[in-house]
């Protein structure tokens, strides 16, 4: 389960000594005479990492404490609450003790922070990057390096779904038959209408087919970002545009498909459509406790869903992922694969802190402790050549992505990375989507926010 305390911690303490993030120690070190990782000698400088991913908070805290214990280098980590990273980054960068390591999500963000991003061309994290396309450039300058390679789609409980397939009257007899939107919707409709029957037959605790589609700040990005990616991707593809850089104007050609998927999510769920923005829903827990069969999210959910401390009933063997079938090229479609997690180094930091930060990141991707934490505790797929053998991904969702790619399916690019003024555009889309779903607005309002809002924000972002 994601760390719900993170947002409280951010409100109460944004100081550089705060420990609530993607990595960090549980307290500052009083010693500066430890030994650096590898062949480094005296411990100098300090590290302040501003983490993007709340669900990895605990693992990063433990990892950074280990590093401090080994080297004497003080590591402070702060994790932004869901949907609040840009706001938090702006606030922290304005402080005297600003982050030395921060995340940029795409080329537009890298452009925004170009005065702060150090050239990483001659660093270990770039040298070890297996696919150099997973680095962002500003001209010839390498401004950030991907720290994980992620996929998202529709998480599903394969144990329950396979059990359903064996029941009389099931829409399909095998999960493999679910390879397009129409079939997925027919299955979801049937499951949602037969919850009690399924529970009696399988001994399950189902309440719905799809986990709640929350539209609060902690969840809405799944739809204004990740589901919205689908119509963007297919339109960019049709237009011959760069799939991750996008184009200044869109027509909303595939928004009817977006509507069909969204309506399925909300109609085949037990959540009241009028309360989706309440913040009271927990889709992860619904899937984790076996109450839902389907849950749109990414491979970063594997670690919290399988962490025994969270008390969920699902196991790793129960979990898999299928594409967000969109009714366009379903039979050839894979998962959505990419990243919005790029490490950048603050070139305005003191040189000793820059050096300490680069050493810390190198240790994270080369040491046993670092690789174990990233692969196993965080459940991430790292894009570095050091992650072999025991440190290859054990994430069932990443494995599903690899299997689809091996079968010749086409991965969907993360076209949402092209979103101009991303927070503003998404907020307007979410507002319209919330009103539509609650019966207080029209779908035309969603289209307007999506299409006209894109043009408006693109013009503002590019000063046209």
Regions found by a protein language model. Give the residues of each.
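C-terminal capping/gating helix-and-loop segments adjacent to ligand/active sites or protein-protein/ligand interfaces
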Residues: 337, 380, 386, 400-456
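Extracytoplasmic/periplasmic solute-binding protein
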Residues: 141-147, 152, 182-244, 292
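Glycine-centered hinge/linker elements that transmit conformational signals in sensory
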Residues: 188-189, 238-277
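Conserved N-terminal structural module of periplasmic/extracytoplasmic solute-binding proteins
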Residues: 4-8, 22-109, 125, 328-330, ...
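Hinge/lid segment of periplasmic solute-binding proteins
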Residues: 104-156, 162, 200-205, 318-325, ...
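Extracytoplasmic/periplasmic substrate-recognition and gating elements
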Residues: 310-379
């Amino acid at each position: 389960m994601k760390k719900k305390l993170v947002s409280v911690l951010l409100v109460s303490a944004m100081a550089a000594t705060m420990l609530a993030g993607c990595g960090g120690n549980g307290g500052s070190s009083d010693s500066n005479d430890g030994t650096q990782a590898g062949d480094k000698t005296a411990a100098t400088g300090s590290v302040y990492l501003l983490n993007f991913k709340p669900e990895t908070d605990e693992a990063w805290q433990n990892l950074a404490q280990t590093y401090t214990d080994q080297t004497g280098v003080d590591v402070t980590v702060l994790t932004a609450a869901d949907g609040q990273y840009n706001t938090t980054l702006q606030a922290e960068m304005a402080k005297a003790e600003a982050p030395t390591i921060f995340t940029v999500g795409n080329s537009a963000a890298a452009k925004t922070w170009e005065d702060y991003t150090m050239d990483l061309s001659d660093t270990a994290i770039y040298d070890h990057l297996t696919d150099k396309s997973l680095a962002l450039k500003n001209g010839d300058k390498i401004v950030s390096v991907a720290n994980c390679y992620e996929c998202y789609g529709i998480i599903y409980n394969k144990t329950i779904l396979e059990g359903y397939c064996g029941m009389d009257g099931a829409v399909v007899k095998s999960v493999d038959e679910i390879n397009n939107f129409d079939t997925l919707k027919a299955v979801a409709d049937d499951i949602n209408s037969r919850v009690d029957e399924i529970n009696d037959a399988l001994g399950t605790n189902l309440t719905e087919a799809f986990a709640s589609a929350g539209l609060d700040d902690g969840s809405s990005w799944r739809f204004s970002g990740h589901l919205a990616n689908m119509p963007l991707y297919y339109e960019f593809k049709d237009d011959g545009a760069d799939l991750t850089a996008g184009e200044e104007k869109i027509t909303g050609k595939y928004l009817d498909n977006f509507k069909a998927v969204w309506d399925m999510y909300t109609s085949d769920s037990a959540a009241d459509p009028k309360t989706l923005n309440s913040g009271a829903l927990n889709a992860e827990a619904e899937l984790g406790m076996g109450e839902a069969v389907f849950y749109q999210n990414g491979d970063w959910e594997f670690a919290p869903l399988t962490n025994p401390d969270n008390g969920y009933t699902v196991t790793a063997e129960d979990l898999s992922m299928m594409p967000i079938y969109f009714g366009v090229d379903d039979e050839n479609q894979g998962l959505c694969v990419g990243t919005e997690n790029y490490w950048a180094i603050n070139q305005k930091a003191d040189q000793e802190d820059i050096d300490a930060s680069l050493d810390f990141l190198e240790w994270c991707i080369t040491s046993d402790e670092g690789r174990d934490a990233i692969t196993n505790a965080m459940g991430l797929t790292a894009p570095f050549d050091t992650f072999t053998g025991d440190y290859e991904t054990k994430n069932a969702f990443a494995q599903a992505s690899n299997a689809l790619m091996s079968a010749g399916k086409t991965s969907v690019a993360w076209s949402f990375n092209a979103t101009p003024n991303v927070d503003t555009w998404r907020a307007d889309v979410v507002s319209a989507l919330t009103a539509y779903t609650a019966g207080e607005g029209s779908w035309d309002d969603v289209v307007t926010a999506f299409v006209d809002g894109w043009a408006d924000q693109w013009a503002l972002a590019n000063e046209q």
